[in-house]
Amino acid sequence: MAKEFELNEVEVWDGNYAASQALRQAQIDVVAAYPITPSTPIVEGYGSYVANGYIDGEFVMVESEHAAMSGCVGAAAAGGRVATATSSQGFALMVEVLYQASGMRLPIVLTVSNRALASPLNVRGDHSDMYLGRDSGWVQIDAFNAQEAYDMTLCAFKVGENHAVRLPVMMHQDGFTTSHKAQNVYPLKDEVAYKFIGDYQPVDEMLDFTRPVTHGAQTEEDWHFEHKAKQHKALMDSRTVIDEVFAEFKALTGREYKRVESYMMEDAEVALVLLGSSVETAVLAAKQLREEEGMKVGIISPRCFRPFPYDMVRDIIEDSPVKALCCLDKSSPGGAMGALFNEISAAAYSTSTRPLMTNYIYGLGGRDFAVDEAKRIMREQKAHADAGHITTEIQQFSGLRGPKLGFFETRRS
């Protein structure tokens, strides 16, 4: 029987510790992990809970992140509630097994403290690893601060383990900016948190010897297509479950979450779209510009990167007077438009208004995104809206040292 962990009504936790506390409250059976900056404190925290008797689960220390996710796959297939944590190069090493986990429909929870991918080597936060996982078949949920890192980790178990979903879930938080920043967090009592998540009810667990099953079977052109189509459908169908889980969490805590968060969009003529901790910076900048210059600025932030909430983004754009929309990607685009820009463009294309769309690459390797820079971008969007066309390159690098870097101009007759 696990010992009780004393919690105050308000704790001062960073995002990593908040996530580790959520893992403890979920009473996980197995964590298989290989530590890497900046997510190390998550698994360190879990290891200390096990060592000190605060949880009855197993902490398996392995030789690599590939082995960590492999261990998670085995434990989940055996019928356990399983989680781990990683970042950056560790995430990259896991990628092969991420596809195994989702293809086998195993509801593992992976807490990711986002960090830049080498080379050059960098331990600071951007969204390179988050974007790397976008086609892996996992649900991806984003936290903007430490409170949300705690809340979203709890929700991740309830979403992934739902029998209508049965898919693994990533909970993303910005490395250092969220993972290491201490903030007020309002935790649930252990029994309340566990009741919210519920007992794990595995499906087709391998340790049920009365009902032998096969996991990870080989399929070729005869059935592979159908398997992947069903997996995609399950991911898309999870949208309803995510909404239901968020609604239940609101009823329990009063904290409301949506698959897409929007701020001041009702009358916004220009808007920024971005992810993670930068959302709070952008909201502050928008409020200041509204007060100082009367500029009608709004913010859109998808909380669920997968399944991507195209319908909700479309409705937010359609229901606002927005004329210019800027998508900010915190990852090197590698010779193309940013991933967030591409997703938002798909949603915006289905609207009748079709606002002007631009793409900013920002914050790579942890480069600071300041309020003044957010205001500069907003003013540039206002210039586009006033002119009725994009007055700069469609894609620009924000906060870059040296000459301005931009690509792809619109053609005007």
Which residues does each PLM region occupy?
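Short acidic, glycine/serine/threonine-rich loops at helix termini
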Residues: 42-45, 71-74, 94-98, 119-125, ...
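Thiamine diphosphate
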Residues: 1-132, 137-138, 154, 402-405, ...
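Conserved thiamine diphosphate
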Residues: 124-168, 172-175, 353-367
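Redox- and metal-dependent alpha/beta enzyme cores, enriched for Fe-S-associated oxidoreductases
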Residues: 265-295, 308-315
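Glycine-/acidic-rich phosphate or pyrophosphate-binding loops and their flanking alpha/beta elements
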Residues: 12-19, 247-270
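Conformationally flexible catalytic loops at phosphate/diphosphate-handling active centers
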Residues: 168-261
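Peripheral docking tails and interdomain loops at the edges
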Residues: 329-413
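Short helix-loop-beta junction
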Residues: 47-52, 284-299, 349-350
